[in-house]
Structure formats: C-alpha cells, structure tokens
Amino acid sequence: HWFGTDQLGRDIWARAWYGTRNSFLLGFCIALSDVGIGMVAGALWGYNRKLDPFMIELYNVMTNIPSTVYLVLLAYIMNTSYLTLFISMASRGWIVEARFFRNRILSIRDSEYNIASKCLGSSTWRIVTKNIIPQIISLIIMEAALCIPYSIGNEVFLGFVGVGMPVDAITLGNIVNLGRESFTQHPYQMLLP
C-alpha cells in the first residue's frame, strides 16, 4: 500500500488511480463539449455581426457570476451525479470558449479569401467550415488540452466542499474529502492523492 489505507482499509493508491481515471473521463467530456459548442458559437458569433450585441450581453451576464459560486449552487440544487457535474461545468464553459474563438475569427474574417468566397456566392456556413475553422484548428486543440485540467480542478474542488459526486463514487474530489476528515491523525490521506 504505497499511499497507505483509509479508515475502512481501502488502498488509497488504487483508489487514487481509479479516481484519476474517472476525473479524466469527466474532464475530457467537458472539454469536448465546451470546445465543440464554443467553437461553433464563436465561429457564428465572430462571422455574423447581428449576433454580436446579444452574445456580448450573454457573455457579460454569465461571466459576472463567479464560477465557483455558480458551480456550487448548481451542484447543490441538482442531484449529485456525473450528469449533474457535466451539465453544471459545460453550461458555463462554452461561452468563455466562444469568446476566445470569436476574437480569433474577427481577426481572419475579412481576409481576401473569405471576401472572394462571399463574392462567389458561398454561404456563411461554408465559409466558416471551409475557410475559418481550418485556420483555428491548432487553437481548438490547445483549448481542449487546457480545459481538461481546469475541469478536473473544479471536480476536485466540488468534491472537497462536499457537493460533488455521491460519496460512493470514486473521484479525486471524494478521496480528498474523505482524507480531510482524518487530516489531523493521517495527513497523507488528503495530501497524497
């Protein structure tokens, strides 16, 4: 038992690996949804000027609420499950990604090849999918890679506070939360995972 055992005699090393797998799976799903929805919304937002006032106000409203308060409130109101965590994190993250992609698309929207495509009669959807999204594919990969640890951190925070996953689910947040209860006698149970 490299990390020792908890109060019930369960191996913390094995639970940490299993919890890491569950947390990575949740983080990967959230990253896919955030970047996927944010990319499409940001592409349309950056290319279509009519959406700009509405999306700016939506962005301002959603980002003025601190993310930790938002996540704790949603997790507290809804039942604790993977779906609840996924919905609460994904409903907040896509707008930040959309703003990021919008800013990049604004810089390449008025390029000569986009103007030429528009003059030749290409639809907005075709210009966005054929000309703009291939230009930002490296940013899509980078944002997805950065979104995974952020989502894992949020899951650990919610589990530590006690509003994350159910107690019987093995996640990093629940392992740290269980280690917090015996921190004074066995600090390694909280610090090692």
Where are these regions (language model features)?
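Generic hydrophobic transmembrane alpha-helix motif, especially the helices
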Residues: 2, 6, 33-38, 43-47, ...
